[in-house]
Amino acid sequence: MVEVKKLTKNYGNIKAVDNISFTVGEGEILGFLGPNGAGKSTTMNIITGYISSTSGTVTIDGKEILENPKEAKAKIGYLPEIPPLYTDMTVKKYLEFMFDLKKVKLPKKEHIEEVMRLVRITEQADRIIKNLSKGYRQRVGFAQALLGNPPVLILDEPTVGLDPMQIIEIRKLIKSLGKKHTIILSSHVLSEISATCDRILVISNGKIVADAKTDELSSSTAGEEKLALVVEGAASDIISAIKNIPAV
């Protein structure tokens, strides 16, 4: 469904994305894990066609994003980290506007009602978006991504800034959408991706450093402990002391 081959993005002498390749199968929920600045959002923006790559290709359901941008983009629903909402509109008016902007070729009223039902915002249809909680605004963002029934959903940090209950609700929503869509979800939090995704790619400094099923990756990191210490003294003495610790 999604195929990325030898993707590279340079900003001057900096490689934001460094020759990465991966595929995502139909109906798969893929987690894209890495710290801030690792290259996650850059990769997402290339996949969705928002920016071009320096080299490499992205193919969405058989359509290459640069050669067939219109056809490829029509197969993608994108939810950026900050949803593109017009907060002075009502939920319904906003979705009608986005429906027209995307030139969706489906019955307008019925399709918008179905999308609102899927993300559970039907009762919020006539409310002004700026008066909604962050959790409901995120659901409106999901609704706009679903307009047109795209087979692929790209979700960039979809739970960032939400409270614990809202996070649980969004996780459930993503899992339910995964039954009918291929999903790529980015996050810098392993527990967040582990709770939602079938498979995890780990990216660091623009390179993929791990690719595994969620349970396999969770098992490989289980039992590891991290300890943060604050030490005082000469740097040379501290380094010497650390080197004398077994297994360090």
List each model region and its residues.
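Walker A (P-loop) phosphate-binding loop of ABC-type ATPase nucleotide-binding domains
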Residues: 35-39
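Conserved ABC transporter NBD signature motif
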Residues: 56-67, 71-72
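Conserved ABC ATPase "signature" region
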Residues: 96, 100-124
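Hydrophobic anchor residue at the start of the ABC signature
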Residues: 142
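Catalytic Walker B motif of ABC-type/P-loop ATPase nucleotide-binding domains
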Residues: 153-157
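ABC transporter nucleotide-binding domain
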Residues: 171-248
